[in-house]
Amino acid sequence: MRSVVLVALAAAIGNMLQGWDNATIAGAVIYIKKEFHLEKEPKIEGLIVAMSLIGATLITTFSGPVSDKVGRRSMLILSSVLYFLSSIVMFWSPNVYVLLFARLLDGFGIGLAVTLVPIYISETAPSEIRGLLNTFPQFCGSGGMFLSYCLVFGMSLQESPSWRLMLGVLSIPSIAYFVLAAFFLPESPRWLVSKGRMDEARQVLQRLRGREDVSGELALLVEGLGVGKDTSIEEYVIGPDNEENEGGNELPRKDQIKLYGPEDGQSWMAKPVKGQSSLALASRQGSMLPRGGSLMDPLVTLFGSIHENLPSENMNASSRSMLFPNMGSILGMMGRQESQWDPERNNEDSSDQDENLNSPLLSPQTTEPDDYHQRTVGTMHRRQSSLFMANVGETATATSIGGGWQLAWKYNDKVGADGKRVNGGLQRMYIHEETANNNTNNIPFSRRGSLLSFHPEGDGHDQVNGYVQAAALVSQASMMPGGKGETAMLPKEVKDGPGWRELKEPGVKRALMVGVGLQILQQFAGINGVMYYTPQILEETGVSSLLTNLGISAESASLLISALTTLLMLPCILVSMRSLMLSTIPILILSLVTLVIGSLVNLGGSINALISTASVTVYLSCFVMGFGAIPNILCSEIFPTSVRGLCITICALTFWICDIIVTYTLPVMLKSIGIAGVFGIYAIVCAVAWVFVYLKVPETKGMPLEVISEFFSVGAKQQDAAASFLSDG
């Protein structure tokens, strides 16, 4: 995993440059005003700062769709070039107009980085550490601000500080970013899969994961190309298989699925549960309308049912999965068969290599029962992990996809009137196990090593003898089986790119509502307005009175305080993202209210300065820990691969438009209603944001991206269907 961490860190340098720019312009604008005599021109001052935001907004309009066509890596390289060019022009700027043009170029680079870096990291990171890696952009942004504030503070101590040098230093880290983007960063494997470039995607995954066999994850990326096609949630009870036929081969009973373990002789039976569901996932999906007048979105409850049943964080790696030990290795045995993933062996024609997914996951199983009897159980255990449905003819193979999830496929074969089997299509299954904490049947179990030791109870086959419960999202597969079942073909329509009509999908619309809502509330909570003008705000609140005895000017003192503030901006996504926002937003409200009170009540210069400085510091630190980092992370996770670039563009446009409004209007608002009025408005917005997060924002931590999209789709469709049924009734 070391490689994927380094890749995420290198990509996040683009955000470090954004933070660097935010800090330098905040310090440089103090001296820009003096040189160009803008003290009485707050609109021009605001335009100098906001011009980069205008550029970011303009470039964001095209960044998502263009990145879907040319790739994420190419756009990051372009971002580094724009950063460098803008810094050179800012260093040369002879007048305000050239400076405004340079700020526009700078905004182009910022817009590309801020929009695409979270997407890039989400598309390259494994689900188990995706949330942690996605803190890198915010961490690097805060680090860039800290370093830049320190640099600007040092320059401000000179007799004649040069704002051109402050802005021009950006060219140095821009060169480093270009080198890393051009020669170190790989292309996003999900983007490569969406273009049918399977062999390149496999090589990238091998590099990022540090192992040769990545066939399971590669198949997951293919399945992520199609979301929400008649998805249903099914419930299973899984227990020991003690049935044997006369030949020693274990056969499943009717309507049961056999799961083979990693060792010879290990097998389980998965029995579909009919009637009222006892599983949290399946039962909560049963009623998608709010109950008892509750305003909480049922999707929040549906996602929550997954995280309530995840093993505790302090479990060791071998016990994180009750049903699938070692993160799913009971079913994911194909990972040991590196030789099975061989384009030359599976497909003589190498020209079709990019079109086909030559994967053991769709194994060449025969569909006739007699062929199955000819196989020995031991060979089946060693070569693949399979699921068989008796008397129906369904076969499937499965692999672990992280986060306690398994991806499985089954051929939905039907028996025709002539007694022959007819291919009913390929279905995928995202399987998730329940933990002991939610064992509603009170069935005893014990843990032996990393495997479960089952204790059958009762007589007869009609009684539930299993001790592990699981739920599965079942829908039509994106892959299309090849001639003998050895090859999974990519859907032809994938290469045509996303269309606007896909935004009408219920799951995509619901995800857009969450993403756009978070971006609006985040910006109108005032974070960027506060950051851009932190030196001036602290100067106006009287912070210089605390440092006059040190011989430091008011401008330098405010820059020093800003540097110390950014040092505290250490984001933390080691816990639930939803819980982190719900915990930190009240602190934001409290700090803003304290700032308002400190501005209205005269307690003396030193006391007022301390209150204002402490309030701003707490606000910035808590904001970046929660509400500042999470919206971009969440937006990079909740959309399907086929429309991710387009949806991120919509969210990013919302981000930049709101950012422009906040940044451009702040100088005017400070003069008209003062600091107390401005931060009073921000406090009200934060209160609204807390309500929105509580009612509408689900928890996605640790879930594969494809599963997240599937949940949004199935939840939104079923809720819409239920609402339509009630309205018609």
Swiss-Prot record:
Localization of this protein: Vacuole membrane
Sequence positions bearing Phosphoserine: 446
Extent of Polar residues compositional bias: 356-367
Gene3D superfamilies: MFS general substrate transporter like domains
Similarity comment: family membership: Belongs to the major facilitator superfamily. Sugar transporter (TC 2.A.1.1) family.
Role played: Sugar proton-coupled antiporter which contributes to vacuolar sugar import (e.g. monosaccharides including glucose,sucrose and fructose), particularly during stress responses (e.g. in response to cold).
UniProt name for this protein: Monosaccharide-sensing protein 3
Species name: Arabidopsis thaliana (Mouse-ear cress)
Gene that produces this protein: MSSP3
